Amino acid sequence: MTMKTSVAARLRWIVAGLFAAGSLMAAPPAWADGTPRRVVSFNLCADQLLLTLADPAQITALSPYALDDSLSVTTRAAVPFPRVGWDAESVINLSPDLVLAGPTDRPTRAMLDAAGLHVVEVAFVTDLAQAQRQAREIGTLLGHPGRGEALAQQLEQAETGLAAAALKPPRTAAIVQRGGYAEGSASLITAMLTVAGLRPLAAVPGGFGGFVSMETLLVDGPDVLVLLDPPRDAADQGALFITHPALRARYDERHRIDLSSRYTMCGGPALVQGLDRLREALTPLR
């Protein structure tokens, strides 16, 4: 398993395990005029929202993942900004007036809270309505409600475009990544596929997903196989599963969608691009 793919897979499993119903968790803003001036992001999804919604002068630092183009769609915009380490000290030393953290950062958050910093938790989103709500909330938090509304409208327009291109009648789909791990129904990508006219295969574990066998995919498989971050060759055991010749033969380009997980882990601009990419990917399936 490559480093980048293992990071993407690990983040997806964490997203599943730490699903939160709300988009934002925080106390009221601590700054006087309602506009934070020194914002640090400690989270991949927060990076992308911050780069999209904040003024450059508001951004003090981003997370270590900010320049990883296998995970983020805003790497070019992230280049000018410093990045923190995976430790509370690197954040505290910057004296931010707002820290955007994720649900996975709780031990670090406890240290940031103890240091008196204002920390907002940016929750993972698992449906499109949450993504729109999150865009509005973060935009307002940063003092730019108009930008948050504009991003929410972009998300809505991308969803509408995908819905207009949806497969009819609906078909079954399984979302599989390295090693045969299949996404369950409680995921953002499943919500995206539902809009596209693709419903989960009954044989795939529900909820947050689980592993599916090669036999299931070949004998009782879906109409469409969605591969997340498919490797080009069988360089390791994880890649061997989804590059298997029988699987390739069963799911040719008319029955397969290849999609980068960077479009399916976060809301915001990543989701806008992901909805558009998925709409384009439906064309060969018709």
Q: Residue ranges of each PLM-predicted region?
A:
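Extracytoplasmic ligand-binding site segments that recognize negatively charged/polar headgroups
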Residues: 124-137, 172-191, 234-236
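Short helices/loops that flank or line small-molecule/ion binding pockets
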Residues: 88-96, 115, 212-221
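Bacterial N-terminal signal peptides that target proteins for export
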Residues: 2-18
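Alpha-helical, coiled-coil/dimerization segments enriched in small aliphatic residues
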Residues: 65-70, 77, 183-210
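A short, structured surface patch at a secondary-structure boundary
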Residues: 37-94, 98-104, 201
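Structured C-terminal subdomain patch of bacterial secreted/periplasmic proteins
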Residues: 37-38, 130-140, 149, 229-286
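Basic- and aromatic-lined ligand-binding clefts that recognize polyanionic substrates
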Residues: 37-50, 146-198
